[in-house]
Amino acid sequence: MVRLAAELLLLLGLLLLTLHITVLRGSGASDRQDAAAGNNNLNLESDSTSETSFPLSKEAPEEHQVVHQPFPRQRFPPETGHPSLQRDGPRSFLLDLPNFPDLSKADINGQNPNIQVTIEVVDGPDSEAEKDQHPENKPSWSLPAPDWRAWWQRSLSLARTNSGDQDDKYDSTSDDSNFLSVPRGWDRPAPGHRTFETKEQPEYDSTDGEGDWSLWSVCSVTCGNGNQKRTRSCGYACIATESRTCDRPNCPGIEDTFRTAATEVSLLAGSEEFNATKLFEVDMDSCERWMSCKSEFLKKYMHKVINDLPSCPCSYPTEVAYSTADIFDRIKRKDFRWKDASGPKEKLEIYKPTARYCIRSMLSLESTTLAAQHCCYGDNMQLITRGKGAGTPNLISTEFSAELHYKVDVLPWIICKGDWSRYNEARPPNNGQKCTESPSDEDYIKQFQEAREY
């Protein structure tokens, strides 16, 4: 088998030589100088058989790989009269094996001839001229090998020099960064390496997609009732927000405002002593007696409440769900601050049974009363304008005094035994923006009959 492979390899070499002869005949090279140049190339490649491209191995006689490599073009001065190259005619070529040093001792009839053949095709003058006409078709790499190695060494030395500072102030967008050089120890943290965590982009666990909560933000107000927020990452392009209330000392001026209002109340009531319970008649045993209270002060106070408070938005403002929000009132033509009033402390299921969300206006230094607007919304987030779920104005805001708010605004509802029809008659719900009536007439009549029967 080895002998057969060697014979086939020799036959292949002879076929390639024959092909070469045919090419030489087609090119019209008939002078002896070209033949002598070909002879020198053959001798040169025969002497360097250790660098041949067709080695024959005993271990893998049937595995051959053909590697296409560009052949260097070399020129040698012609030598005439070489005995190993003979010509019988103008276009004949004979290969005399005994005249080759490495092939003269080869035994073709032996079992394992050690033969290595290298063939180099040298382009003729015609083909060289043709290639020179299209130099732009081939990429030109003008950087020689020594210059490339020098540039690479300079890049590596620069990376090593800056590696100490690069750990602390590395910026991927820096112009001095070398994207080809890989710093040593890139797969493990270097000694003394410092890690900076930013609040703008908190890290999160890739397993559950949720990161750690950030610190609570500063309270939204410096006095009174406000809120705080904190966030965390919940995945790609997702940020979760959590909110909580924060109580601060009462804002300066509120006490003075209430003291002024108390003075006005005492003067309007014709008495120097101010008693809010007696004024609003919340200690009466009968709802009718509370409703029949028509003091001059109450009339003026209610008039101020109507003129001072904003109108209820027709739809629930979602921005107040986590924080206070400024909402423009197109009737008053200015902004009013609102906050959510849907928490458990409001007990909507008792006082506003059909309401899902409620909001309450906030006091400001421009307020002429201590009242707050109260608006409630259904499941469709539309304003409830009438019925047992409609919001009613609070004569005393919870911001000022939760206890006084309970006595003035909540206790009358309890005295009337939850009969919202009579309570809303004394404290009519607000619909200053002429929103669509809700609930419908049929539902409203049904609620009214149930309230009367109760």
Swiss-Prot record:
SUPFAM superfamilies found in the cross-reference section: TSP-1 type 1 repeat
Ranges of Polar residues composition bias in the record: 38-55
GO cellular component terms listed in the entry, alphabetical order: extracellular region
Location of the protein in the cell: Secreted
Residue spans crossing the bilayer: none
Compositional bias per record (Basic and acidic residues), positions renumbered to this chain: 128-137
GO biological process: negative regulation of angiogenesis
InterPro entries in UniProt: AMOP_dom (IPR005533), Angio_Inhib/Adhesion_GPCR (IPR051867), TSP1_rpt (IPR000884), TSP1_rpt_sf (IPR036383)
This protein's domain notes: The C-terminal AMOP domain plays an important role in the anti-angiogenic function of ISM1.
Subunit: Interacts with integrin ITGAV/ITGB5.
Protein name: Isthmin-1
Source organism (scientific name): Mus musculus (Mouse)
